[in-house]
Amino acid sequence: SWTSGAYFKRFREYFLTEGKLEHIHLFVSRNKVFDKESVLQETIIIKVKKTSEKPETVTITSSKSNSDFGELTSLTVPYDLVVAGSDYYVYLVTDENEVEVLKKLHKFDKTLPAIGVKMKTGLTVDFRNREILRDEEEEGAIPLFYSQHIKQGKVEFPIQKEHEYVVTEQKGLMQDNKNYLFVKRFTAKEEPRRLQCGVYLAKRFPQYQKISTQNKINFV
């Protein structure tokens, strides 16, 4: 979280102003480092030098676990590519392909608000609103979309999942039935595609004026 989380912005600003990253080591596997404790944890090791002088590059190495340091992969990456922007985001690239993708991303000079688009978090926290959840459609019910409905760039509904509908009059839990891009907020590191989106087309569900989204997805 400290490398990109919003709550850690002030920490990153102080930390990376007072010091500079020299070396980052990444563990590819999340379950091998603390395998005896059965902990699934993202783990990195960093070397920081207390200085205001920015280095030209950062060394990024990676290994599968803490038992195979003899099989490291190593990259030398421009510092401005790893630590970037006014938010001091730290980008943890592991191979040349990711470096090339990052170079292309850094060329983008517009944010979503700059082009008139907003991203919001799904409206319904399902476990806090159990009384409005429904397993099947009934009179007055509207669809509740989860991350599981996002499949291969599309939004599939229904999928015979529990609690796919809600019955509510709370305006804060409903949104207009119009076209959206749904984005999964959480994906596993082991998944082949970390950014997973689905196009929601309102014309596929003309019977609804309103829909709802679970808070583990974002929508644009």
Regions found by a protein language model. Give the residues of each.
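Signature of N6-adenine DNA methyltransferases within the class I
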Residues: 1-117
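Polybasic, glycine- and aromatic-enriched phosphate-binding surface used to engage nucleic acids
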Residues: 100-220
